[in-house]
Structure formats: C-alpha cells, structure tokens
C-alpha cells in the first residue's frame, strides 16, 4: 500500500498478509495490490520474491475515478494474460476487444445530455439500499449518452406537504421513480 504520511509504497504489509495465507495453506497465484499509485518494477520484483509469485503476477488494483476503468487498468498490467496462462488458455485465446470499455469511458467523460431523476423511497439514507436501481439508471444514461443525476427523496418527507410544496419539491426533475417495497409507510 501507499503510505501517504511517508510518501512511499510499503511492501511489508502485503508480504505479511501473504505469509499468513501461506501458513493457512493458501498459495497465491496472483497478487492484486490496492494502491493509490502504480507499483514500480522494484516493488513488483520485491513482492514477487517474498510472496512466492512472479513479478508479472503482481498487479496494482489502482484507485480509479470510475469503476468501468478497472478492466482497462488490469489489461494494461497484463492480468488477463496471466489468468489465461494460469488456466492453459493463452495460446488459443483471441486478442481481447476492449472497444466497448473504451466507448463506455469516453461516453462517461463526454456526456451529451444531462437529466435529473427523483427516486422516492423509504430508505434513501442508507447508501446501498437502492444500489442496483442506481446502477440501472447509470447504465441507461450511458446507453443514451446522458448523465443521470439522482435526487434521493425520503418518502416520509412528502406526506404532509401541500400540493404547491410538493410541486416545488418535484420542480426540475425530468422523472420520478418509486421503487417497489413492502408496507404503506411513506408511500400513501
């Protein structure tokens, strides 16, 4: 991991973690090392040597601004090749076509439109409650080259609003989505 206070990468925590795995009978084939910065060749060699894997089997799981960049990052570091070699499939595997991944990233960096959707739910304060719904809206936005901004609205906050206050709350929304749920709380 990258230690910000020291301003450098430290390999010892990874070495110790792999040692514990080996004590439990688990031998790593590949190391995916979480890091904010890329691993240098020296760090890869050192980790490979002390963790009993090849330097090519040490891959940085870099922090990225967009989750859809991860396959491209792993490909750039050769993880796909290492996996194919491990399973004896490298010689017969076709060259990967990453065009769609590049298109997704390009679309997300250059949306042509923007839309705001209100999601009215009972548990909007819990971050992962509507995760699949959020991702579905993001995917729909990518398909339409449109950035989807979601306004999370707790359903109970709407119960006692006047019609005018409700209209003001909904002003600026291109659409409203009410996820399915159980019970009547907040949805009447």
Show where each model-derived region lies.
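N-terminal beta1-alpha1 cap of cysteine-dependent amidohydrolase-like domains
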Residues: 1-188
């Amino acid at each position: 991991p990258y230690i910000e206070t020291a301003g450098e990468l430290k390999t010892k925590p990874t070495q110790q973690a792999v040692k514990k795995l080996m004590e439990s009978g688990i031998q790593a084939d590949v190391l995916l090392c979480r890091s904010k910065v890329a691993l240098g060749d020296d760090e890869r060699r050192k980790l490979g040597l002390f963790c009993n894997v090849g330097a090519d089997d040490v891959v940085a799981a870099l922090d990225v601004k967009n989750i859809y960049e991860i396959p491209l990052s792993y490909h750039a570091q050769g993880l796909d090749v290492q996996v194919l070699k491990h399973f004896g499939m490298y010689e017969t595997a076709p060259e990967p076509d990453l065009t769609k991944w590049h298109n997704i990233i390009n679309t997300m960096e250059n949306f042509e439109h923007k839309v705001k959707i209100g999601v009215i739910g009972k548990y909007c304060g819990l971050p992962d409650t509507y995760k699949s719904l959020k991702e579905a809206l993001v995917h729909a936005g990518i398909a339409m080259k449109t950035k989807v901004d979601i306004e999370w609205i707790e359903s109970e906050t709407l119960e006692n609003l006047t019609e005018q206050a409700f209209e003001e709350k909904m002003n600026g929304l291109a659409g409203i989505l009410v996820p399915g749920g159980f019970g009547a709380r907040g949805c009447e």
